[in-house]
A protein has these predicted regions:
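Single conserved hydrophobic/aromatic residue that forms the stacking wall/gate
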Residues: 1, 402
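Proteolytic maturation boundary segments
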Residues: 2-33, 38-39, 43, 74, ...
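M16 family metallopeptidases and their MPP-like homologs
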Residues: 37-48, 73-181, 200-205, 213-215, ...
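PPIase-associated folding chaperone regions across multiple families
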Residues: 52-59, 77, 186
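Short, Φ-rich (hydrophobic/aromatic) sequence segments
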Residues: 56-64, 159-160, 393
Length: 402
């Protein structure tokens, strides 16, 4: 039986049941109006977290969008055909869903964005993708699981999610083994069964004033008696409990880190990872956007470029096959170049990253589209109230000198 800590289950409690949703036979399209930027959501219903569909949406969402060489990444994001695009799978107890999201670029309609997303779903259904991408997806999923399990919160949530969704724990821990046995034919068959291009739910988020908004009068606030002079037996027991003093452990840079020198007296700090089979390598440069604001957009520009011998898609695919990541982040005072992933592939990833940085080639058309997209993204941000609040907070707390 299921239990949580010292809580005893009620054997008389009836098992939850629900009335299944009727099968969808045609597109269900809804429009939401608001001041925020426009976007489109496409969704397909799948089985719940304990069904076979739960495994497939993990794979399919990564085949569509993984940040490097998914169908949406290569065909849309890296070619800047939309401002932003992505796909994800959501697993719940009764049903799951496969979702594709699109943010239109300047001059693009939501219907055009929708059709682009459906075209990529069509490629998946037709098997128009590299079968070797499946093996790379499994390796990257393995890497993601190792990273997640470094945090105690994620370990705890793995138990919680399995418990809430009614997934047998044995099935939960064997997920990676099952995924590794999935073939391209399995993916194509599943996509044709579940991702019908004629049967989906679409939500169009358009700009405008919603005429159906109902204003509610502000109610009179009722005073609340806080009873701060009283305490429950539970609180009293906690307050009376003996607490062992925490003994802090501080990093000793002299003994906990190995320090070395490279050419030109570049300092190297090293610490072996004894927790799992992952690595992280950082190149740190002591200048940033306060030195030159152009570094900010330069890092975004770099992410869209290839070299004289390799396209961006080929480079991203190599990193994905290695289950490694490479990125450049421009901060105010420093620029960070990060390489991370499976430790067994560290040498190959570092070599690939350094060759990429040394041989990257600019593209005027890519830069022009990046500028246009950046301006739209900034204008979209002005439509978001939270973004405006954050900008005001930053403006009032930071002194600008230029």
């Amino acid at each position: 039986y299921k239990r949580q800590g010292g809580l005893k289950p009620n054997p008389e409690l009836p098992e939850w049941s629900f009335t299944p949703e009727p099968a969808m036979t045609a597109p269900v399209e809804k429009t939401v109006l608001g001041q925020e930027a426009e976007m489109i959501y496409l969704g397909w219903r799948t089985g719940g977290a304990s069904s076979e569909d739960a495994d497939m949406i993990q794979l399919v969402s990564s085949l569509l969008s993984n940040g490097k060489c998914g169908l949406l990444d290569v065909d849309i994001q890296q070619q800047q055909k939309m401002l932003g695009v992505g796909a994800e799978g959501l697993q719940l107890a009764d049903y799951g869903m496969m979702v594709a999201i699109g943010y239109p670029k300047p001059g693009q309609t939501l219907e055009e964005a929708r059709d682009m997303l459906l075209d990529e779903i069509g490629k998946l259904r037709a098997g128009d993708f590299d079968e070797e991408l499946l093996a790379s997806t499994i390796a990257n999923y393995k890497r993601g699981e190792m990273q997640a399990l470094e945090e105690n919160g994620n370990r705890a949530m793995a138990y919680v999610d399995a418990f809430i969704n009614g997934v047998d724990w044995k099935r939960s821990v064997e997920e990676l083994d099952r995924l590794s046995k999935v073939t391209k034919a399995d993916v194509v068959a599943w996509a044709n069964e579940k991702l019908d291009p004629e049967v989906y739910a679409a939500v169009y988020k358009r700009q405008g004033v919603d005429p159906n908004i109902h204003k509610i009068d502000k109610p009179q606030i009722t005073p609340i008696a806080t009873n701060r002079d009283k305490s429950s037996e539970f609180l009293a027991a906690i307050q009376a409990a003996e607490v062992e003093a925490v003994q802090p452990v501080f990093v000793d840079y002299a003994s906990d880190l190995s320090v070395g020198k490279m050419k030109q007296d570049i300092e190297v700090l090293y610490k072996q990872n004894t927790t799992n089979g992952l690595f992280s390598l950082y190149y740190v440069y002591d200048f940033g956007t306060t030195t030159d604001p152009a570094f900010g957009i330069a890092s975004d520009y770099f992410d869209l470029l290839g070299t004289d011998t390799q396209s961006l898609q080929e480079i991203q695919r190599e990193f994905y096959d290695l289950a490694c990541s490479f990125g450049i982040h421009a901060g105010g005072e420093r620029i960070y170049v990060t390489i991370s992933g499976l430790a067994e592939n560290m040498d190959k990833a570092v070599k690939l990253a350094e060759e990429y940085m040394q041989n990257v080639e600019g593209d005027d058309a890519v830069l022009a589209q990046l500028k246009a997209n950046a301006m739209k993204a900034r204008n979209d941000a002005k439509l978001n109230q939270n973004a405006n609040f954050r900008a005001l907070q930053q403006y009032t707390s930071v002194s600008y000198t230029h």
